[in-house]
Amino acid sequence: MRYLTAGESHGPRLTAIIEGIPAGLPLTAEDINEDLRRRQGGYGRGGRMKIESDQVVFTSGVRHGKTTGAPITMDVINKDHQKWLDIMSAEDIEDRLKSKRKITHPRPGHADLVGGIKYRFDDLRNSLERSSARETTMRVAVGAVAKRLLAELDMEIANHVVVFGGKEIDVPENLTVAEIKQRAAQSEVSIVNQEREQEIKDYIDQIKRDGDTIGGVVETVVGGVPVGXGSYVQWDRKLDARLAQAVVSINAFKGVEFGLGFEAGYRKGSQVMDEILWSKEDGYTRRTNNLGGFEGGMTNGQPIVVRGVMKPIPTLYKPLMSVDIETHEPYKATVERSDPTALPAAGMVMEAVVATVLAQEILEKFSSDNLEELKEAVAKHRDYTKNY
């Protein structure tokens, strides 16, 4: 399974093409749109979310509510594009129109300046448009397809925010994936501890009044993953490594950890390793899950627990100093639309990219042309694992 995304933030549409989804997977536009709505939600989101109401259109690969095995093409129309017809025109336009929204003041923390140097742009809008987090719309759409596939294989995934700008959220122990999903869905800030809800919302309001932004940490948990996805035989086949790449590829994500993560560096080995248990009913299990569901780069049957850290959104309403690329004079950075935080939405994107990588691994390990064969192969493997 592989995919590509295309489109600009203020262009006419966003597009994704997925190849390798088996035939026979039940799939509707609403399956995708539900996750797109979740991506646009969350406390603290701003003006763009009021303009766009993303809805996907299938243009290939799905017929009568099921995948056909052919490449799946999905489009999302950018409604805001009507205000940008000249600025984002594919055809050449008059110089006076080109300069109308030209960007020469790069924003610190964005791709603006480096992209301009790399691709030799005199208008940094070219960098801004493609590097925008608007691109994650299609990664969420691809992830929604992946999640439908995982659900057919009895795998469940959820995400929630565990740190808001330095404020850690207490997470009750032993919550199931379903419980995490339910609690986070009921929260405007995607946390599982409702007692902290108003405190976090008040904090976001204060950050907005200050013209500033905050980052934080989001966690994705996946249950029901078969044993042995990934491999230790080559570095690039380790599944946790592939997940790490996917997570830090998300806009503004700067780090990733599994299970205890960096805390493991402060503990003794006897306090980190997960003891192995066996029972006739459950087969092999672990006493703890400090390693986040991975051993040797492979899934061990425990829930996958992965966290990603997101830096504060770099677009500030009290902009930092920058330099004009034409005059080299100091200026305040360009201000585009921004939010005080996008952590709940970022969690949705992280859930999507994790689901996508897991779907890719499942299809690699249990190669099948249609859903029925895939389900049979996974069920057979689970029986083998239990009786090993």
Swiss-Prot record:
Cofactor(s) in the UniProt record: FMNH2
EC numbers: 4.2.3.5
Binding note for cofactor: Reduced FMN (FMNH(2)).
Lineage: superkingdom: Bacteria
Gene Ontology molecular function, alphabetical: chorismate synthase activity; FMN binding
Pathway: Metabolic intermediate biosynthesis; chorismate biosynthesis; chorismate from D-erythrose 4-phosphate and phosphoenolpyruvate: step 7/7
Swiss-Prot/TrEMBL catalytic activity: 5-O-(1-carboxyvinyl)-3-phosphoshikimate = chorismate + phosphate
Listed InterPro entries: Chorismate_synth, Chorismate_synth_AroC_sf, Chorismate_synthase_CS
Gene Ontology annotations of biological process type: amino acid biosynthetic process; aromatic amino acid family biosynthetic process; chorismate biosynthetic process
Pfam families the record matches: Chorismate_synt
Stored PROSITE patterns: CHORISMATE_SYNTHASE_1 (PS00787), CHORISMATE_SYNTHASE_2 (PS00788), CHORISMATE_SYNTHASE_3 (PS00789)
Keywords: Amino-acid biosynthesis, Aromatic amino acid biosynthesis, FAD, Flavoprotein, FMN, Lyase, NADP
Enzyme class: lyase
Binding-site positions, FMN: R130, S131, S132, N251, A252, G296, K311, P312, I313, P314, T315, R337
A GO term from the CC aspect: cytosol
Residues reported to bind NADP(+): R39, R45
Record's function text: This reaction introduces a second double bond into the aromatic ring system.
SUBUNIT field: Homotetramer.
HAMAP family linked: Chorismate_synth
Family: Belongs to the chorismate synthase family.
PANTHER family in the cross-refs: CHORISMATE SYNTHASE (PTHR21085:SF0)
Record's protein name: Chorismate synthase
Organism: Streptococcus pneumoniae serotype 19F (strain G54)
